[in-house]
């Protein structure tokens, strides 16, 4: 299903906390508009390239009941896909070139940041955070080489909670090569700049300035219809934010704040 009812710009302009002035001043938005137009909307052969694999990560103690419930929705909507929950034991056997850096990380969620890039680089497929609920299958996006989702657009931020990729995509190779620091001092900014959203966004644009084939960063409606900014408000029906094109709903557990 190709969603053509609204343009990329229309979707982001209707997003929570949209800032027209910031959007107009950032050349990154023009790049995202172009990727969406050329790699998603344009008629093309849509044969599968991304492997039918779903990867999730849970390190440490047993995952909460809600996470188990959300995880089941991914298997339910993708009955023919391979599903893998990566635990501490699995990570022991994963090929991690810079294992010393991984072992030095003290925040469990930041370890997960580190691992998702290596897992997708080696195996391909779709990585999904454990607090995501699947609303519809992702099969019709597998013709792409790489996809991710945009956050709530003041500045361009690409979120890392849901990423699809072929193995050894240039973006992932660039990330793994340049991920040389991973410190957590209690500041989310430090984490975001070394392994998280800000780091990922920087690496993404460094690559797509040259390599644009099959790459799309989808508007928030696709994977993040429920805004992080309103998750703490009382009596909010998060499902009321879901759109016809929404493939997933992020419940924003923000578990990294509590897991060090």
Whereabouts are the PLM-identified features?
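Glycosyltransferase-associated regions of secretory-pathway enzymes
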Residues: 1-112, 130-260
